[in-house]
Amino acid sequence: SDLRATKGAIDAFRAMGKQCKDVSNGLPTFISPWIDGKKAIMGTGKLTREDAVSVQQHEKEWNEIFDGIHEVVDACAFQDGHIDYDELDAFFSVNKKLADRYGMQCWTNAESFDRDMPINFLPIKFDKLRMKLEAAKRAGYDKAITFEFSHFMSPQSAYLQAGHLYDRYREYFEIK
C-alpha cells in the first residue's frame, strides 16, 4: 500500500504518543482527528465540498495510521462534524472495526456547534446532537466527548441556545 499520504500522520502521532507515554509513566493517550469529509471546508467559503474522502479511502488510510500508532495511542475520538448525518453509520462502523482490530478504544468527539449554518458557529440543535450520539451508540463506541462545551453547551455561555442545548441533553440522558 502507498504510505505516502499517511506517513506524516503516523510519524507525528507516534512521536507525540510515545512522548506522552514517557512523561506520564504510561498513562492512556488519545487523539481526536477530523474525518476529511464533505464539510471539511475551512477557508473555502462553501458549505460542502465535492472531493470528500470516501468511506473506503478513510478505512484504508486509518488502517495504515492505526497500524503505525496503536502501541502508543490507546483511543481515537474522531471529530464527527465533517461528515454528513446520512454517513454517520458507515464511517462510525469503520472507525469501530479499525479500533477493535488494533486493540484501541473508539470514542466519538460530538461537535456541539452547527456547521450547516452560514453563520460560524452557533450551538447545534439537540436533535442533530442526538443523531450523532445515537449513531456512536449503534456502532458500539466506548465513550463520547464534545467540542466545545464552554461555548456551545454551557449554561454560562453567551449563547442563549447553549443553555437550552444543555437542558435538552440532561433531559434526554435523565441527568438530575
Can you describe what each PLM-predicted range is?
Residues 1-176:
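Glycan-processing catalytic domains of CAZymes
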